[in-house]
Design a protein with these regions (language model features):
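Nucleotide-state sensing region of NTPase/ATPase domains
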Residues: 36-119, 123-135, 186-194, 219-228
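Long, charged N-terminal accessory/stalk domains
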Residues: 111, 119-164, 168
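Conserved lysine of the Walker
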Residues: 28
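Alpha-helix boundary/capping detector
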Residues: 57-64, 150-154, 248, 272
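Conserved NTPase motor "head" modules and their coupling/switch loops across ABC/AAA+ ATPases, GTPases
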Residues: 1-23, 36-37, 49, 65, ...
Length: 277
């Protein structure tokens, strides 16, 4: 209901799967996106739910019947109504507790290798939120603290005590998020290597490693850079600057791999998600 380009739509997916055919801009991807959001409360195409509502609408709804489950979402700007088997779930965490994992593969997966760090952080966060129950909480807590701290940095009459309080919150949640990302990549990296060997050239060696934006105590780093942050009006250090180092035979895949090799790496990264989950 009022999701993307659909006012309403009903779709029964056979157990053996389905192939969706249609012209450009008819909403094929939006159908898959709706399934993804129903299961994970996340879209792989946008960071916020707001753009998922149809043009001119503030709310949207999705309902789905799955093996042993009936899920329903009514998403509004105030508070989403989340139900499983007709019973309301008090928060997003309880809604997701018994949901199904999702691996999203799309035409833009090449951006995992070619584009900037934002695409790779989204990859980590989409997977991490399904892999560990504390990941999503750490991520959203960090984002809230970051938004408030940046707001304070931009205002001339800021309260220094309040700024320090949010700096501590940012460091607390950021340190937890960094730890979870590092653990995630330690587990994920071997799956990526194996996936690449199974579909690419066996003699080639692909490696993916987590690169934190800052080493050492995050709170100390933030305090040391506060004058610079005030000058720029935003926080320069923290997990929102993290990245992944992707190499092929020890060299940067973005700079030295062919487009075919880059595409194989991107597919391997998605197949590794499936193996891990």
């Amino acid at each position: 209901m009022d999701f993307r380009c659909y006012g309403s739509f009903s779709w029964q997916i056979p157990q053996q799967g389905a192939i969706i055919l249609g012209n450009n801009a008819q909403g094929k991807t939006s159908l898959l996106e709706a399934v993804c959001f129903l299961l994970r409360l996340q879209s792989p195409r946008t960071a916020r739910p707001g753009p998922l509502a149809a043009h001119g609408k503030q709310a949207f709804g999705i309902r789905g019947e799955l093996p042993g489950q009936a899920r329903r979402i009514l998403w509004t700007p105030d508070a989403p109504d989340l139900r499983v088997n007709g019973e309301p779930r008090k928060d997003q965490r309880s809604y997701l507790a018994d949901s199904y994992p999702v691996v999203w593969m799309g035409n833009d997966d090449l951006s995992l290798v070619q584009a900037g760090a934002d695409a790779r952080r989204k990859y980590m966060d989409f997977l991490g939120s399904q892999w560990h129950p504390g990941y999503r909480l750490a991520l959203f807590s960090y984002r809230r603290a970051l938004k408030t701290r940046n707001y304070l940095l931009k205002h001339r009459h800021r309260d220094k005590l309040q700024l320090d309080a949010y700096t501590r919150q940012l460091a607390l949640h950021g340190t937890e998020l960094k730890s979870l990302r590092a653990s995630l990549l330690t587990l994920l990296a071997p799956h990526i290597t194996l996936a690449y060997r199974s579909i690419g050239e066996r003699e080639e060696q692909v490696a993916v490693a987590y690169r934190a934006s800052e080493e050492g105590d995050l709170y100390e780093r933030l305090c040391a850079a506060v004058d610079r942050d005030i000058r720029y009006g935003q926080t320069q250090n923290g997990p929102h600057r993290d990245d992944l180092d992707i190499t092929l035979n020890g060299r940067s895949a973005a700079q030295f791999a062919s487009e075919g090799q880059q595409r194989t790496i991107a597919i391997s990264m998605k197949l590794a998600q499936s193996s891990l989950l």
